[in-house]
Amino acid sequence: MRLGRYVAAEALVLASALAGATWATRASLRFFSERGRATAGQAHNRGGADPEVSVALLPRGELSRPPNPAIIEEPAGTFLGMSDEMLLQRVRTQAILGMKLNKGGSTLSFRVELADGSRAAFKPAQTDLRTIPRKEVAAYRLNRLLGLDAVPPAAPRMVSREEIFSHLHPDSLAALPRIRAETVFNPTGRTAGVVMYWVPGIKDSDLDTPEGIHQSMQWLTQGQPIPVDKRSLAAQLSQLVVFDFLTSNPDRYSGGNMKTSADGSRLLFMDNTMSFFIEPEGNEKTRSILHRTQRFSRQLYEALDRVTEPVLEQVLAQASLGEYQILTPSEIRAVVARRDLVRRYIDGLVASYGPRNVLVFP
């Protein structure tokens, strides 16, 4: 039932972003507003809170906001030692010379050859709502706001039907009927997709297997030792736990979504297109992982203060592209509500075990 509401809402947002139609925008706003009123009573019954009523449940002190809140500038971003802005400029503006459909995925994604010889990944707007391109942009921007460098730089990019079809790799021509059927184009023949830096040589890991999860949770449990050679990885896993709870990403542990850099030293927070659900309490999977985690990064904990509605609105607006809406107001409110929950959870651990035992990573 919850997934059905999400898919219906996403379809309205997609219609608004692609067509820019007034009726679509108004319909989307009506949907979220009516959903909030209709489910306010249900929230009490299920023990959770609805996005539209969750703000009223927060302590008054956490709602206070200065009359003119200061605009927080995003930390200067880097990714694998390279400037984010340089990588973003490249994937946003370089001409497309080739597109090859990535095999094995249940949704559409392409490897793109750019004019300067670099590569990018491209995910178009599509009928399969398990891939929502704008969510990848939101995940990257949230990652950057938190001072992380784990999500590959991602930006919205409008790509025309002609760019895709005329540059399609010969190996992908057999998939042309599927590409035509599943790619959503607006009336001008363009698709509102996301383009991302192509990370060379990424590797799969076993961190999302039952054994891998059990082992990593041991490193993040009070009283358990962290092997010296695993301390950096443990710190990154702790960051991932918080990040996935904030984005409400249930897909991380579904298999194949725990990637590392070529040398295995860096954990990459990739595949975020099925995230940012509007339930403020998050989903069962990410909530369960969070509540098993008892060691965190001090810098990330402090960076949670930046995650407010005004700042998120500003950051996402700067990354937007015309009518391309990155997150809806309900999705932004849900992120902030989850921020409050994770901060309270960590505060509770600090009260029980002390800051030196909880905020153990830089």
Residue positions per predicted region:
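N-terminal secretory signal peptides that target proteins for export/translocation
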Residues: M1-R2
